[in-house]
Amino acid sequence: MIFHLLFDLDDTLLDSNIESLVPVYFQKLAAHLADVLPPQEMLQELMRSTMAMYRSTRVDQTLEQVFSEQFYPPLGTTQEALAARIEQFYDEVFPTLQPLTRSRPEAVSLVEWALSRGWGVSVATDPLFPRKAILHRLRWAELAPENYPFRLISDFQTFHFAKASVAYFGEFLGHLGWDGESPLLMVGDSIERDVIPARQAGIPVFWLKADGQSSPAAEGIPQGTLSDLKAFLERADVSALKADFSSPAALVAALHAAPALIHHLTRVTPPEKWNRRPAPGEWAFNEILCHLRDVDAEVNLPRVEAVLGGQNPVVAGQNTDPWAEQRHYIEQDGAQAFREFVAARARLVEKLKTISPQEWERPARHTIFGPTHLRELAGFMVEHDRAHFKQARETVSI
């Protein structure tokens, strides 16, 4: 199993003072588009649209889609109409922000050292920026993606959640292709965007802090400078740095993230591939979508309601695979199936969000697995999602 290091970008790999950088970035973008809208009004729209991304819980809209839906209508234009101007900004104007940042030689050395050990290195940056802006900042950090084989870099074209959302980390692990077992560590400087949500997601964390910093949220976790991080990794048994999805917060986050991952596949998969079976007896993408929809609506939701409403109820194991042929999934509307899956999953997630810690431990008797409880049943749902996302990704890549 490979060990995965997930690095934050701003003020972790790059000295950027992000709170100071973003206002200058917005001012330059507003000035670049001054002929479209007066700069002060443009700044207001940029901030409003960015906050919409930050707060979004939509699994059927990427952050870019959320931003565009908020940003362009008040301007009286469309994303397509301004696309060339926006590209020009990121090609020509955004790079002029580099002097506001500073590379960290110790971060470059650490990344190179980690890669030399065969570890996977990814950039888990807040995906509130277009990919071009993120790649520019990596180059400013002297970690150009052309030269460093990062396994994943989050961006707003792909991701559905900002980093303050626990679901971001479930989405990140899905795109990473994480197998559910490999050890990993999140490294970041922000308590609100790195430490708290990653811990709630069940991911081990190293808090990158300045001298004298302290926080109750970081009690009991490794912390320090980049040099301290390297020393920690040298002496630690990294194989023991395992994710733990057993907490209610981690389970809900993973279940929330799953349809966002599937949504990504619906966007990148051409229509002619939706009904293409990779081999005889294997499911097409369309069939996987229908399966996820029906399992949520007819298995997962009723199980949760039975456990919450009964006294140690019997939960029957169900073989749902034959439904693919019995219900002619291959002939159904895959896009509609996805929309219905999103709706069913939203009901499931909202139900689980509202229950008490005691209710998570309510018992049940599974006809296959024996004595269990609601929290373990939710864990089965997470594993089911992970298996079918992996299957779907492999299916559409053929």
Language-model segments: residues:
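Short, acidic loop-to-helix structural element flanking the phosphoryl-transfer center
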Residues: 61-66, 81-84, 91-123
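Helix-loop "lid/cap" segments that line or gate small-molecule binding pockets
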Residues: 24-35, 61-77, 323-324
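Short, contiguous alpha-helical
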Residues: 275-320, 346-349, 360-398
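Acidic/histidine-rich alpha-helical segments that form the ligand environment
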Residues: 258, 263-267, 303, 321-361, ...
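Active-site neighborhood of HAD-like aspartate-dependent phosphohydrolases
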Residues: 1-48
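Asp-based, Mg2+/Mn2+-dependent phosphohydrolase catalytic module
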Residues: 1-5, 108, 112, 126-129, ...
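Short, helix-capping/interhelical loops that line the mouth of catalytic, cofactor-
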Residues: 236-250, 298-341, 398
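A metal-dependent, Asp-based hydrolase signature
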Residues: 44-92
